[in-house]
């Protein structure tokens, strides 16, 4: 609950005791949920840029305490987890890999599909017993699910043992929220329907020293009819270029070999700047001059992928020619229902431009099958587009209605057995083309950024090529964190086996 909601209710104080009798009804009276309707009405209010700092009141709040964060969903959630972990550690908390040892447990959630939400509710069920054993444990739910009013109300009614709920726009207020949890016997809820400002100088506990996430913008204004993200992540807000460039320079100085620029729609970067014309192409053109071997970005929206960005990417160097370009459907009619704001031909024209500028570019995509009203003929159009483009890989999904989105009001009239059959056919095509493209690597020598031991065999090292191909090979452990040359000896559908050739590559 934020301060406005608290003042409006006039019913909550830190000294109140938790009511076991009618707890959920009590909170229904004072809790104002995030509003999807209001999200769609948002205007173009000026975004404020603020610097994060921890109030001296909260210094040492975590001394002698441990935290555990379980992350669901996309790279943005992984990035947010790094930020929250950084805040925890700045407060004096220590990380732990065990829920049993934790004094604070956060579930950083994903709302993109119903299956992701079910996993979180299942985990809450498992943690109920632990909370009963450790009543002083703080159990929190954050991330995109927290921005959905139906989810918050479900937690209030069915999981009243949860201590803390907060959304995606107020991660920077974690110190205040934790302090309130310790002082109050009530569930602490702070979910802002309105997107927050851009907060700089946030601490981060990055996972490893090889690859790093760099957020360049927040939110999405596209409002595709099936997607909950514009509601859970808010309007598009870009970080200032100088802040991003400084962060990338710091990572380069710390020895990172690869960075990925993050945003719900990175191609819209800079469109909200009123004082200058500056887009993703301009940013990439500056970042390519920084001494870091590899720079990627995700996720792209075809609608905003402009010619200037293609021109800059074609300069190569540390700008990788692996582009994730979600198409969602090969049918113009379905794309119109999805409100993607491009049709089949416009997408194919964009692909042609990319391949003309970067003949060796690797393209991957996202595809949804079984969207409302999708016919057999329209699904065949998706298959034909996939064959024409020959994507290196695809993330494929059965359509999942999300409450509050326009598509959820459409009649979900494609039977589940048809959806599953279409997904099976699509995946067969995806596997076929992937195997064909991977086969072309046999006998080639590729550069691999070594990330660590293989998950299946500690004697084998694993890493990725510039085109995101997984490579497994034998090499000394000293190769971890370096870019090495590997000759490919065997291609599989989704990975490559090889032999290390020579020493690690020096990157100047």
UniProtKB/Swiss-Prot annotation:
| Reactions mediated catalytically | N(6)-dimethylallyladenosine(37) in tRNA + (sulfur carrier)-SH + AH2 + 2 S-adenosyl-L-methionine = 2-methylsulfanyl-N(6)-dimethylallyladenosine(37) in tRNA + (sulfur carrier)-H + 5'-deoxyadenosine + L-methionine + A + S-adenosyl-L-homocysteine + 2 H(+)
This entry carries the following GO cellular component terms, namely:
cytosol
Q: What is its main location?
A: cytoplasm
Signal sequence bounds: none
| Keyword Signal included in the entry's annotation | no
| A GO molecular-function descriptor | metal ion binding
Keywords recorded for this protein, A-Z? 4Fe-4S, Cytoplasm, Iron, Iron-sulfur, Metal-binding, S-adenosyl-L-methionine, Transferase, tRNA processing
Q: Where in the cell is it found?
A: Cytoplasm
Required co-factor(s) are: [4Fe-4S] cluster
Any idea what job this protein has?
Catalyzes the methylthiolation of N6-(dimethylallyl)adenosine (i(6)A), leading to the formation of 2-methylthio-N6-(dimethylallyl)adenosine (ms(2)i(6)A) at position 37 in tRNAs that read codons beginning with uridine.
Family per similarity comment: Belongs to the methylthiotransferase family. MiaB subfamily.
Please describe the quaternary structure of this protein: Monomer.
Protein's name according to its UniProt entry = tRNA-2-methylthio-N(6)-dimethylallyladenosine synthase
């Amino acid at each position: 609950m934020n301060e406005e909601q608290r003042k409006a209710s006039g019913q909550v104080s830190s000294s109140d005791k938790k009511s076991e009798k009618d707890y959920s009804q009590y909170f229904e009276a004072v809790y104002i949920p995030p509003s999807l309707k209001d999200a769609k009405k948002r205007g173009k209010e000026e975004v404020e840029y603020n610097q994060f700092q921890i109030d001296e009141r909260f210094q040492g709040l975590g001394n002698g305490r441990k935290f555990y964060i379980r992350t669901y969903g996309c790279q943005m959630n992984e990035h947010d987890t790094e930020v929250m972990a950084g805040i925890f550690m700045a407060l004096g908390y220590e990380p732990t890999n065990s829920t049993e040892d934790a004094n604070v447990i956060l579930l950083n959630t994903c709302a993109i599909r119903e299956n992701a939400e079910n996993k979180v509710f299942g985990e809450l069920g498992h943690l109920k017993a632990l909370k009963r054993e450790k009543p002083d444990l703080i159990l929190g739910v954050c991330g995109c699910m927290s921005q959905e009013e139906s989810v918050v109300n479900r937690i209030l009614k069915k999981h009243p043992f949860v201590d803390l709920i907060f959304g995606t726009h107020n991660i920077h207020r974690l110190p205040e929220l934790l302090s309130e949890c310790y002082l109050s016997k009530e569930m602490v809820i702070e979910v802002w329907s309105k997107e927050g400002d851009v907060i700089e100088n946030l601490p981060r506990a990055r996972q490893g020293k090889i690859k790093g996430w760099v957020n360049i913008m927040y939110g999405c204004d596209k409002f595709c009819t099936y997607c909950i993200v514009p509601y859970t992540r808010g309007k598009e807000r870009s970080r200032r270029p100088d802040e991003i460039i400084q962060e990338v320079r710091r990572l380069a100085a710390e020895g990172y070999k690869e960075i990925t620029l993050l945003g719900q729609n990175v191609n819209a970067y800079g469109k909200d700047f009123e004082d200058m014309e500056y887009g993703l192409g301009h940013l990439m053109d500056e970042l390519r001059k920084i001494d870091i071997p590899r720079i990627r970005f995700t996720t792209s929206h075809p609608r905003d992928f402009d010619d200037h960005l293609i021109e800059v990417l074609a300069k190569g160097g540390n700008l990788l020619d692996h582009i994730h370009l979600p198409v969602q459907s090969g049918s113009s009619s379905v794309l119109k229902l999805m409100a993607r704001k491009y049709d089949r031909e416009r997408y194919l024209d964009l692909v042609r431009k990319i391949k003309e500028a970067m003949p060796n570019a690797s393209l991957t995509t996202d595809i949804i099958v079984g969207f409302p009203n999708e016919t057999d003929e329209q699904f065949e159009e998706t298959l034909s587009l996939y064959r024409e483009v020959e994507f290196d890989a695809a993330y494929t999904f059965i359509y999942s209605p999300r409450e509050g989105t326009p598509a959820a009001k459409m009649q979900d009239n494609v039977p589940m057995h048809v959806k599953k059959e279409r997904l099976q056919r699509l995946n067969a095509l995806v596997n076929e083309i992937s195997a064909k493209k991977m086969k072309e690597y046999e006998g080639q020598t590729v550069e691999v950024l070594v990330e660590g031991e293989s998950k299946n065999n500690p004697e084998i090292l694993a890493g990725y090529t510039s085109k995101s191909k997984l490579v497994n090979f034998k090499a000394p452990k000293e190769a971890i964190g370096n870019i090495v040359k590997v000759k490919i000896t065997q291609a599989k559908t989704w990975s490559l086996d090889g032999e290390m050739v020579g020493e690690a590559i020096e990157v100047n």
